[in-house]
């Protein structure tokens, strides 16, 4: 790469540093971490979303864990030994100031390296800010020809290119870095922006140069799934491609990379495991209550695509692991796949009729009509809570086609809710229960939607009326991410409403029964041990009762239990279904019963690096099997969370409708097509 190419590359990487620094400033401003220095180093107001805050919080805590572990270990060494922290690509990070203010640099010093322009700008910022100067003590500012931009007794800032290792070594020597002292090398979202050969050379150079060292990196991984593809495309659009992911896509490959480069020990965790295993329950609860939050899928997927790694060498730093091993494995991988279910696109939707939304609900009104409402999606060229309805219907040539519909008349308007449920009452009528407008605004009341369709059953000329459902007074259902399932008691039809969350309660365990004929809430006895509360679970009807599977429980714990609300003479009885082999905990999936089997479709899990396909559970034997989805004939990526689905048993097909999400800071993605899964291989008796 020539000088101009290097300069352009430095500029694009610097833009990612600027964005990251602003996020860290917002993180501190909203109480996730204590960092009064972030605002001093990065001027200007900024407000990031709760999802961005959580993502940067777990990043900050993972790096903090490694830095504190290094300082604890080296503090036990003889008093003449000074520990060294070498931060590579440090940008506007406030690490030095936080450590100095906490009194953790009495026997340690910090060196930072970044592009010369970045380092000089930071040095100038420190020079002109009294609060920062108070931490550094007496200092010198280097001249424009020197690689040393800032120097104090325990802090150096250097301007250098990490790809030019000989010059880097000379600059560090000149700045007083002692290669024989215990050294922590920190590269926080840095190496992946280098060409793989340059990054590998840097890793090997560090192993050769520092006999007692710890190398910590925080980076992206898992580029091959749907979320990973959106992540890759985002950085490509920024002209900052993630070079290392093709050769080192998973943690195992990254560990091997360091071991082959001369590091003697290496361990790594994805951020879900770090968050669940190495942060206390009290700290997690503090963070989870700081702001209203309802983007669990994207939070867990973000954490599944980043890792923290610590490689060590030398007698001093290889004896104690940075990440203490756990007695129980965090990994809960699904069973080996029993086969594949082929997928194909079944709609030829035009842009104006496509179903690009998530968090919606769908109801199969008849074998030829699927009605969808609500959610967050694309409408009139922008992303918003969707006000238009969508109908998938059979055209005359037996192909599905989509149509968007607006509200008819002035009697009522759709309120834009999402994470509600929708239940078929007749071929033209559905009941909408619950939902939210925002994490602090539950939807108001139940709605009845009436679909008026043309006589030829084609999509043209259809309209919808919205009316308040005539439920009894005082029966407001202020929850979302719940389930509504048709059950029967004493030959009467009821809707069983279970779980969910509300503004006040992060998880609910409520059981409510709505008598369909009278639209009245009634009390029906339920025996057996009540299951733990949950939301974002699946529910489907079976043998007059309801099957409940998975979900997010208290403290945002993913659940794997499958429960049956069984009809008995006195009401209902909770039973737990024993499943072998046990299934991977998940949520945000859908479920159907087909040929005596419970199908769990898609969703999000954090205990496996694979992507959920379809889990098949025999309801007679409890035996489970896993099927992957063959997406070779489907435009990629396909995100199977926040979606809805409709079972067509006569055709042995399952339609996947909508889905997607706000993929952290990488952009929002909506599945562009309705997709059919072929279930013919799941015949009865198999």
UniProtKB/Swiss-Prot annotation:
- Compositional bias, Polar residues, is annotated for 12-23
What is a single Pfam family found in this protein's UniProt entry? LCM
Pathway listed for it? tRNA modification; wybutosine-tRNA(Phe) biosynthesis
The domain of life is Eukaryota
- Please provide the Gene Ontology terms (biological process) for this protein: methylation; tRNA processing
Quaternary assembly: Interacts with RNF144B/IBRDC2.
Protein name (database record):
tRNA wybutosine-synthesizing protein 4
Q: Which organism is it from?
A: Mus musculus (Mouse)
Its gene name is: Lcmt2
């Amino acid at each position: 790469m020539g000088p101009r190419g290097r300069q352009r590359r430095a500029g694009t990487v610097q833009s990612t540093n600027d964005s990251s620094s602003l996020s860290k400033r917002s993180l501190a401003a909203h109480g996730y971490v204590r960092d009064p220095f972030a605002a001093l180093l990065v001027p200007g107001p900024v407000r990031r979303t709760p999802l961005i805050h959580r993502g940067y919080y777990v990043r900050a805590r993972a790096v903090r864990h490694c830095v504190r572990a290094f300082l604890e270990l080296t503090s036990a060494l003889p008093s003449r030994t000074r520990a060294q922290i070498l931060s590579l690509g440090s940008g506007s990070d406030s690490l030095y100031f936080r450590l100095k203010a906490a009194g953790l640099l009495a026997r340690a010093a910090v060196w930072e390296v970044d592009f010369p322009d970045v380092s000089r700008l930071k040095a100038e910022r420190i020079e002109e800010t009294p609060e920062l100067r108070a931490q550094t003590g007496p200092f010198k500012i280097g001249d424009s020809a020197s690689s040393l931009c800032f120097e104090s007794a325990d802090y150096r800032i250097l301007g250098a290119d990490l790809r030019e290792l000989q010059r880097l070594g000379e600059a560090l020597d000149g700045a007083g870095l002692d290669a024989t002292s215990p050294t922590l090398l920190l590269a926080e979202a840095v190496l992946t922006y280098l060409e793989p050969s340059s990054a590998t050379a840097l890793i090997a150079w560090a192993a050769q140069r520092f006999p007692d060292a710890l190398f910590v990196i925080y980076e992206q991984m898992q580029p091959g799934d749907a979320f990973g593809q959106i992540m890759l495309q985002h950085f490509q659009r920024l002209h900052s491609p993630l070079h290392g992911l093709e050769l080192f896509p998973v943690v195992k490959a990254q560990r091997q990379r360091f071991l082959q480069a001369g590091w003697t020990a290496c361990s790594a965790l994805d951020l879900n495991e770090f968050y669940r295993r190495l942060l206390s329950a009290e700290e997690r609860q503090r963070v989870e209550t700081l702001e209203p939050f309802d983007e669990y899928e994207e939070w867990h997927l973000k954490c599944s695509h980043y890792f923290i790694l610590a490689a060590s060498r030398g007698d001093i730093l290889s004896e104690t692991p940075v990440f203490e091993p756990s007695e129980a494995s965090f990994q809960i991988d699904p069973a080996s796949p029993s086969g594949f279910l082929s997928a194909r696109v079944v709609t030829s939707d035009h842009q104006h009729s496509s179903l690009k939304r998530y968090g919606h609900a769908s109801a199969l009104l008849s074998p030829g009509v699927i009605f969808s409402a609500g959610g967050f999606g694309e409408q009139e060229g922008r992303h918003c809570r969707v006000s238009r309805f969508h109908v998938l219907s059979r055209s005359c040539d037996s192909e599905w086609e989509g149509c968007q519909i607006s509200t008819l008349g002035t009697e009522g308007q759709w309120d834009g809710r999402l994470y509600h449920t929708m239940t078929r009452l007749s071929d033209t009528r559905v009941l909408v229960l619950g939902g939210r407008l925002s994490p602090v605004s539950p939807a108001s009341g139940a709605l009845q939607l009436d679909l008026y369709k043309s006589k030829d059953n084609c999509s043209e000329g259809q309209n919808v009326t919205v009316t308040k459902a005539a439920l009894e007074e005082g029966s407001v259902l202020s929850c979302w991410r719940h389930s509504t399932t048709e059950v029967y008691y004493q030959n009467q039809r009821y809707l069983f409403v279970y779980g969910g969350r509300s503004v006040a309660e992060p998880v609910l365990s409520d059981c409510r029964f709505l008598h369909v004929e009278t639209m009245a809430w009634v009390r029906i006895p339920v025996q057996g041990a009540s299951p733990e509360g949950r939301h974002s679970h699946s529910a489907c009807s079976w043998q007059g009762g309801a099957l409940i599977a998975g979900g997010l429980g208290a403290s945002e714990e993913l659940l794997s239990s499958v429960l049956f609300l069984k009809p008995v003479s006195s009401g209902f009885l909770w039973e737990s279904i024993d499943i072998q082999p046990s299934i991977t905990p998940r949520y945000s999936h859908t479920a159907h019963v087909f040929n005596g089997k419970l199908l769990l479709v898609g969703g999000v899990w954090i205990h496996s690096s694979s992507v959920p396909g379809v889990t098949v559970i025999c309801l007679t034997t409890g035996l489970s099997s896993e099927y992957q989805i063959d997406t070779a004939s489907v435009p990629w990526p396909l995100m199977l969370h926040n979606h809805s689905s409709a079972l067509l048993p006569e055709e042995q097909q399952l339609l996947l409708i909508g889905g997607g999400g706000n993929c952290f800071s990488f952009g929002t993605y909506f599945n562009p097509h309705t997709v059919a899964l072929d279930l013919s291989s799941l015949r009865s008796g198999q």
